[in-house]
Regions:
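A metal-dependent hydrolase signature that marks the N-terminal structural subdomain at the beginning
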Residues: 1-75
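A structural signal for well-ordered alpha-helical segments within the folded catalytic domains
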Residues: 11-15, 97, 105, 139-143, ...
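Active-site scaffold of zinc-dependent metalloenzymes
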Residues: 53-103, 113
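Post-HEXXH active-site segment of zinc metalloproteases
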Residues: 97-98, 112-143
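Secondary-structure boundary elements
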Residues: 109-120, 147-159
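Short, hydrophobic/amphipathic alpha-helical patches that form generic packing surfaces
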Residues: 135-151, 190-193
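Short helix/loop segments within enzyme catalytic domains
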Residues: 149-176
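Pan-zinc metallopeptidase signature
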Residues: 170-193
Length: 193
């Protein structure tokens, strides 16, 4: 029988969380990260305790957030729960291998924010957004999350053999180039993947 999309998504989620903590970074029980897969991303976010800077951004975006693959929501301070929220509306329409990349992408963001808070030696996430390096950090985490997510996508897609990758490599490069030209015209140069 065909597994329904919820079962498929939850299996992917479990496998990728395991992959993340086995291959990308060590698990740290002091970092409380909840991962939710929901029908309505915006509603789920509103249930959460957010830092003020993010609350403003969320209110401004509104229900547009329901069209994203997922996002990371930061609590007011690093000792509270960080939320990784993934869309049950958007993700089932994607290539399942891309879903794997998305889980890794969002988890990378969540940990990058913890790392940056540690670097700044702060626990209040609002201060993080005001820090002098925030723009540089923002570009870094976007690159880092895409790198990890895209690497996972490619790795999983061609798990049965790299010959297939060699065969399709030009399509992937064309895809990256197309993404770059679409987004760079909007001034978002980090949008490579």
């Amino acid at each position: 029988t065909d597994m329904d999309s919820n079962t498929i998504l939850s299996n992917i989620l479990q496998e990728e969380i395991q992959y993340f903590y086995n291959y990308i970074r060590d698990f740290d029980e002091k970092r409380i990260i909840d991962i939710a897969m929901v029908d309505d991303v915006y509603d789920k976010i509103l249930e959460y305790d957010m830092c003020d800077v993010q609350k403003k951004a969320v209110m401004k975006s509104g229900t547009v957030l329901n069209n994203t693959n997922g996002t990371v929501i930061l609590a007011p301070s690093r000792d509270k729960t960080t939320l990784v929220v993934l869309s049950k509306k958007v993700l089932p329409q994607k290539d399942p291998d891309e879903v794997r990349g998305t889980v890794i992408h969002e988890l990378t963001h969540a940990h990058d924010f913890y790392d940056y808070a540690d670097f700044l030696q702060i626990s209040d996430y609002n201060e993080l957004f005001d820090s002098q390096y925030y723009n540089a950090f923002f570009l870094w985490t976007e690159f880092h999350a895409r790198r990890n997510g895209y690497k996972r996508f490619i790795e999983y897609k061609f798990r049965k053999g790299w010959k297939q990758f060699v065969k399709h490599r030009y399509e992937f490069l064309e895809g990256i180039k197309a993404n770059f030209s679409i987004h760079s015209s909007k001034g978002r140069l980090y949008d490579l993947m």
